């Protein structure tokens, strides 16, 4: 079983999550169960840019894939790029989309 966390705190957050979920399915990920979509506050260090303080929409999907975890990770990064995620080396930076494999 594979669990993937999906979230967004920039732009049309709900649409971003729906697009990511559809792309995930297009890449051969079979969704067996999914959580509700819920909102959480951004967690930021005290010195973070105030413009980064935007709430996230999040969800988790449970499913299966014929891909190995490393190949699945490559596909997840491809989806993030397709949805215009800006790669920042600052882990606190807002995101159009993120997809993380949960262990």
Regions of interest found by a model, annotated:
Residues 1-103:
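Core catalytic alpha/beta fold that binds nucleotide/phospho-ligands
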């Amino acid at each position: 079983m594979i669990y993937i966390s999906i979230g967004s705190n920039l732009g049309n957050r709900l649409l971003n999550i729906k697009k990511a979920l559809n792309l995930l399915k297009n890449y051969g990920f079979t969704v067996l169960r999914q959580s509700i979509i819920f909102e959480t506050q951004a967690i930021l260090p005290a010195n973070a840019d105030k413009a980064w303080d935007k709430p996230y929409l999040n969800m988790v999907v449970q499913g299966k894939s014929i891909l190995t975890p490393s190949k699945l990770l490559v596909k997840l990064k491809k989806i993030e790029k397709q949805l215009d995620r800006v790669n920042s080396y600052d882990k606190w930076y807002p995101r159009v989309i993120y997809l993380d494999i949960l262990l």
